[in-house]
Amino acid sequence: LEVKNLIAQGARMLWSQKSVNDGYNAGSAVREDSPKARMARTMDEYVTNMPNVPVLVLGCLVRHREPNPEEGASVYPACQNLLLAARALGYGGVLTGFHGFVEKELRELLKIPQGTAISATITLGKPAGKHGPVRRAPMKELIYGDTWGEGATWAVDPPGTQHTERYIEKKKEK
């Protein structure tokens, strides 16, 4: 519980900064039904309930050389596999960086050795609602061919792909 409370402290610190810096209490977020307001409520609830998450995973990397900006990338595929497996079993998961604000205290509490980087904080549990379909941007807007901004001809969305709202609206405008 002590670790979860510590991560919750980091989560509150990060969310309080982000909510102000990204305008989660101003602009469109003032409207209760706006996507930004819904996201802010979700984050408030997530951060408030952080000490109660059923499973908390710290993705760590044992360093074999000097730290570099790309080193965490070797941990993220494992984190992604964990999240995919959790979803396949009906669980929800979130990859965060909440450990960053309390890393020194975490290291002491968990006796994480020097030379080991904490690269990710992952929470897992049963979702409050149902998993909906995964929505994303069309592949041609994410994968370019020979020229930047020009969708690769082979980047074709699989049948049944659902796109995020802003892409659905774009399609309606055309």
PLM regions and their residue ranges:
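Glycine-rich, charged/polar anion/phosphate-binding loops
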Residues: 41-44, 106-109, 129-130
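C-terminal helix-cap and adjacent tail motif
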Residues: 119-174
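Short gly/pro-enriched beta-turn/loop segments at secondary-structure junctions
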Residues: 50-53, 88-89, 117
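Alpha-helix initiation and N-capping motif
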Residues: 1-4, 103, 115
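Small-aliphatic-rich amphipathic alpha-helix that forms the alpha element of a beta-alpha
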Residues: 57-109
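Glycine/small-residue-rich phosphate/adenosyl-binding loop
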Residues: 1-75
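Generic alpha-helical structural context detector
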Residues: 5-12, 84, 120-123
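A glycine-rich helix N-cap at a beta->alpha junction
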Residues: 15-26, 110-135
